[in-house]
Amino acid sequence: MIIRHAFTGWPGSTHDARVLRQSSLYDIGENSNKIGPNKYLIADSAYPLFEWLITPFRDNGRLNQGQRRFNRVLSSCRQVVERCIGHLKGRLRRLRGITLHIIENIVQNIVSGCILHNLCVLRNDNVERFTEEPDDDPNQYPNIFNPAQTGMDKRQQIVNNLP
């Protein structure tokens, strides 16, 4: 569970979608071919749906069996990310509740923590005893976005290919 991209510097109260749109990851997804046509990132419903960023179907009580299965599989895959964050916070307890007041120091602490986490993973450091449990509600955010058609098409293609 290597951390491949970290974008910091925004208050925790800022909506995830706004932070995404300000990140280099958004620019990569929207303006380059680095992610590739047959690859995508996964996210929870706090994020907008794009062809390169796949989110769950909005559960308005009318999801079909394939859509519900897709949401379960996506949630299961996203839990890898949640466990990685739990490992990061477990290894570096300072990141659980940063009390610094200078934003540059907070950013440096988080990025340094991600680097140290990656070094521990690469050296096979066992972190299980330090981990936090992920949130119980995998889709805690209502999907408030009007998804891009290409994102909807990509998501439906994934649903159609699930066993």
Feature locations, PLM:
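Short, well-ordered secondary-structure "scaffold" segments embedded in the functional core
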Residues: 1-163
